[in-house]
Each structure stands twice: as C-alpha cells, then as structure tokens.
Design a protein with these regions (language model features):
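N-terminal Rossmann-like FAD-binding beta1-loop-alpha1 element of flavoenzymes
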Residues: 11-38
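Predominantly flavin-linked oxidoreductase catalytic cores and closely associated redox partners
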Residues: 143-293, 297-300
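Conserved Rossmann-like nucleotide-cofactor binding loop
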Residues: 21, 44, 197
Length: 600
C-alpha cells in the first residue's frame, strides 16, 4: 500500500471509508487483482473508537478470518460460547425458575471438529468470537499497508461526486477537514463504506422511510477493569446430563418491557454493555445516558458496572436506517451502515454487510474482467438484500412489545430466529470452504469452487437460504414479518385475557438442537425444554470436503418443520382458548338474563 495525498488518483475501485467494512472491501478487491484507492481521513478518535458489533455472528467470522487475514487476531479474542437471551431478570440476584431463557452453545463438540482435516476451515466456519473493534481495525490497517494494489488517500473525506455515464470513470472530489488539501479520485467502481455518514444513500436519494411507527434509540458503553470473579455461580447453568456452563461466556441479551440490554465480555477484563429502547415506550426527550443507567440499575447482576470504569459512551436517538439499493448498474455500491442498520442487531448487520459486499465483489469482478454488467445478479442482490434487512428488523420488532412477558411467545419468537440461523449453516459452510481454499482469489478456483460460488450467488442471503431459496425474497420477508406479528398478537390476547403461562427455558447445542416443545402443552410444570445430547453416527459428520453436507442440508428442513408444528399448536391452542372464553361469556350472559327474569 502507498499512502497518498496527491491531488489526482485513479483506480479500478474507490472505497470510501476506512472502518472495518471499508478496510475489508479494499482487501477484497485487491485480492481479486484490481487497483484500489481507499479514501478517508482518520483521526485519533476514529481509530480508538469502541464501536458496536463486537459479537461475530453468522457470516462475519468467516469473511474476517479469510479475506481480512484476521485468523490469529480473532483466535486471540474472547471466545464466544454462544448466545443467551433472558426475560424477567429485573430485580433478581440470579437466574431462577421464574426467568424465561433461550440459549444456544455455538461451540462444536470435539468429535465434530476432529472430523474435519482442515482446522482453518473449522475456525472460519465455527470460530465465533467477541472482538474489540479498534484493535481489529488496527490489524486490518496493517494488513492493508502491505498490499501494493491499495493506495490509501488518508487525508480527506469525500465531498462530492460526478457519476459517469456509460463506460467512463466516476470522479470523487475529496477535501481534508482543515480544507488545506483536496483532490479527485477517478474510478470505474465506487463502494461507499462511510458508515452512518451514508454519503451515497443521502446524496443520491436511496433512503427508505419506515412507516410502521417502530423507532428505537440506543446508548452503549465499554467498561474496563471488570473482574472476572463477578461472574460467579449465579451465572451458571446446569444441563440435564449434569454439564455446567456459565452464561456470561455467551453474548447475553436481557429483555424487558420496551428495551433490550446486551452484555458482551471482551479480552482484557473489558465489557461492552448497551441498551436499546422502543422510543414509543420511553420519553424520547429524556437523556439516553440517564435511561442507560436507570435500566442497568434494574439488574443486581450488573451492579459491578460503575461510571468510573467507563472507557467510552455513545448514544443515538435514531438507529434504524434502510436503503432501497445495494448495488447500481451505474457501477456503485453501498455497504455496511452506509446502506442499512437495524438496531439493535449490530452484529447481524456486520454479517449482512460483509456477505452483500462479497456479492458486489463478484459483480465488479465480472464487469472489470470483460464479462460486462450482470444485471440479473444486480437485481437479485438488491431485492434479496432489502428483504434480508426487513427480515432482520422483524426479528427485533416484537421483542420490544408486551408479548415478551408471555413465555410461549418468548420461546417461539426465538425459535423462528433460530430457524434462520440454522438454515444459514449450509451456505455458511459453503462460503467458508470457498474462502478458505481460494483465499478470496478467483484465479485459485477449481471446478468445485466455481460450483460453490454459483450456489452461493443465490443462497447467501437470509431470505434465500435453503429450503426457501426458490421463493421470492420479498415474499420470504413478508412471511417472516407476518409470522412474528401473529405470534405477538396471540400472546398479547392471552395477556389481555389474564392467561399467564408458566416460564420456559431452552438451552440448545449443536448435538442437542431441537427443544422439547411438547412440554409447552403441560401448564402445571415449568417449561424446561432443554434436550440431552445425541451421539450421531460417524458417517453423518461433516468432513469439510463436501459441497452440500447432508447434516447441514437437514438442519434447515428440520427446524422449518419444528417451527411449522409450533405455529399450528400456538394458533390452535389460542383459538380454543378464544372459543372457550366466548362460550363462557355467552353462557354467563344467558344465566344473567335468566336470573333477571326469575327475580323480575
């Protein structure tokens, strides 16, 4: 890499923004053999900022370990055991039988890891961690500095642009903050990774408004000197077979009425803690720092968090953005927060940012190597990416509602999210294999890798995962939105009519992946839905050399069937309860009229 402040630069690709997504994109295009100009003006604050999105999820780990060359850095990060959701923990000093919980241990059993010869593939596929963003970005910058194809124009920000018509280059005008330096970058393709500045989405009018009244604000901070001893036996969970784990080793989410708290442990005794709130339930004129500390104070388990240990604090009153476009046939693309952000799923957002950037990379590669613009691929990416963000938003939308107090909704809404994550395992394996074996360099492809990339062209989207990859992505998003909404409305009806279901808990693992949902039908007992592990036949284990491993193909289909069965039960049970209530009301009305007639 060369660091440039010259007035005029030219490259195949210009990447705007040198955050984690911008740095990754610069590396992606350099590895595809193209010249890159990376444009940004970094400051001490921007390079040390503790950004959110620390918990790697779905595809993030895969892309960062391979194209990002962060295998060693991530291996040294805080290992993510899984994720753990809880509702009803306010005012309690420990998790107990009145708390609703949903957890998943993402770490694979040793026998599964040992079955794969290429351990780099195992780490790319299943080595999720919790990262300190400025430290990871510093490593990415050092990697970028070694790449001769990348020119880092590090003294200016994009101020204006002229989009080319036809086959010409775009022209991006940049200027330093002190207005002492400026110039122009000419490039065939323009990739906007400017984050919440949203340079292209704002300038070109690609922003989509939300019209459903759901808006969220957020406040978050990173804390130092959090002694690990505070995570004592109160954080322990014992599985049915006797295995003991600690919940704090997961990415922890604590739900309450109209808010969501995340607790993410990091290396060096640091912790990231954030609160997101439904603005309809909290006075939007209140200071979000005050809201943050008020909600944290509701949890005795978090009493170790002190203002004096706060390294950095951020707050934003509006943390939802949506773009109608990811990639344009006019040869520009919008990636990361520049395109869309759905609070509070920042980690999910990073995953979507990197996966859609990879799709755009394939489009750019075809164009710059002479194959021309693949407009059908562009159309599919735009439709599927927008649908993915809608689906992601539906995952969070109703968890802020009163329905979360209903234990069945708590379980079934997370079960629906779990379906998406389970179905993603197959393309996650496929893209991990492609990236690990090619290093992101298409010239290293074999016929098998070409086949993998052809499959991923359609299925590396949340709304195009097998087994629903043949359905239009917008239809999949609408079904997901309606499904979540229906679960919430039935739960709200139960709550409004005095029906209080017993608390429930499900802690799942790769080899104990299906909760005992049948126990929800027995109201006299606590819903302990956690299954015991199953030892599978050795021949079904993933070896790492397959294109579509049978075990991963089965995962999405199995969880789809489980979700459909749970939906049928929820609809039928609630319908029966409605009918019973209606019959009881009518009978009481008849009796009341009879009494009135008798005593008239």
């Amino acid at each position: 890499m060369t660091s440039q402040t010259a007035h005029d630069l030219r490259a195949d690709v210009c990447v705007l923004g040198a955050g984690i997504v911008g740095l990754w994109n610069a590396l992606q295009y350099a590895k595809r053999g193209f010249s890159v100009v990376l444009l940004d003006e970094l400051t001490e604050h921007s390079t040390t900022d503790y950004k959110v999105g620390e918990s790697l999820l779905v595809f993030s780990n895969t892309f960062l370990r391979t194209i990002g060359e962060l295998d060693d850095e991530l291996t040294d990060s805080f290992v993510k055991q899984g994720f753990w959701m809880a509702y009803g923990l306010e005012g309690k000093t420990s998790f107990d039988d009145t708390t609703c919980e949903w957890g998943f241990l993402a770490q694979l059993p040793d026998r599964w890891r040992d079955a794969v010869a290429d351990q780099k593939l195992v780490r790319a596929m299943a080595g999720d961690v919790q990262i300190v963003r400025p430290e990871v970005e510093a490593t990415l910058r050092r990697t970028v500095a070694k790449i001769p194809e990348i020119t880092f124009c590090d003294h200016g920000l994009a101020r204006d642009l002229v989009l080319a018509d036809g086959e010409g280059d775009h022209a991006v005008s940049w200027r330093s903050r002190d207005r002492q330096r400026g110039g122009t970058v000419s490039a065939r393709w323009l990739i906007d990774c400017t984050g919440r500045t949203r340079f292209l989405a704002t300038k070109l009018g690609h922003d989509l408004p939300f019209t459903d009244g759901f808006a969220t604000g957020a406040a978050w901070g990173q804390f130092a000197d959090c002694d690990p001893s505070v995570f004592d036996e109160r954080w322990e969970y014992t599985f049915p077979e006797g295995r003991v784990i600690r919940r704090d080793l997961d990415t922890v989410h604590l739900w309450g009425d109209g808010y969501w708290v995340w607790v993410i442990r990091l290396t060096g005794d640091r912790i990231s803690v954030g609160v997101t709130v439904d603005r309809a339930k909290f006075d939007e004129h209140r200071n979000l720092r005050d809201v943050f500390w008020e909600i944290v104070a509701r949890y005795p388990l978090l009493e170790f968090l002190k203002p004096e240990n706060l390294l950095q604090f951020h707050a934003s009153r509006d943390v939802q953005r949506l773009s109608e476009l990811t990639v344009s046939p006019r040869r520009y693309a919008i990636a990361g927060d520049s395109a869309s952000i759905i609070d509070a799923l920042y980690s999910q957002g990073l995953s979507l940012s990197l996966s859609t950037s990879w799709h755009v990379g394939n489009i750019v590669q075809a164009d710059l190597t002479g194959a021309g613009l693949d407009t059908s691929h562009i159309d599919h990416v735009n439709r599927a990416a927008l649908a993915d963000w809608r689906l992601t938003r539906s995952m969070a939308r109703w968890k802020y509602s009163d329905a979360m107090a209903d234990s069945r909704f708590f379980i079934l809404d997370h079960l629906l999210d779990y379906l998406v994550l389970s179905a993603a395992l197959l393309p996650r394996f496929q893209v991990s294999r492609w990236l690990t074996e090619t290093g992101g360099r298409p010239e290293a492809e074999t016929p098998t890798h070409v086949l993998l990339r052809a499959k991923l062209r359609r299925t590396l989207f949340l709304t195009q995962l097998p087994p629903w990859h043949r359905v239009d992505p917008a239809t999949v998003a609408r079904i997901a939105e309606d499904w979540h909404r229906g679960l919430a409305r039935r739960a709200e009806w139960r709550r409004a009519n005095g029906i209080r279901l017993k608390p429930a808990r499900a802690a799942l693992r790769a080899d104990a992946a299906v909760p005992h949902l049948w126990r929800l039908a027995f109201p006299r007992e606590r819903g302990e839905l956690t299954p015991k592990p199953i030892i599978e036949p050795g021949f079904v284990r993933v070896k790492g050399t397959e294109v579509s491993p049978a075990l991963l193909v089965a995962a999405g289909n199995l969880l789809l069937a489980v979700n459909l069965a749970a939906l049928v039960y929820d609809v039928a049970d609630t319908a029966v309860r409605r009918a019973e209530r209606a019959t009881t009301r009518r009978w009481r009305a008849v009796v009341a009229r009879g009494r009135a007639w008798v005593f008239a």
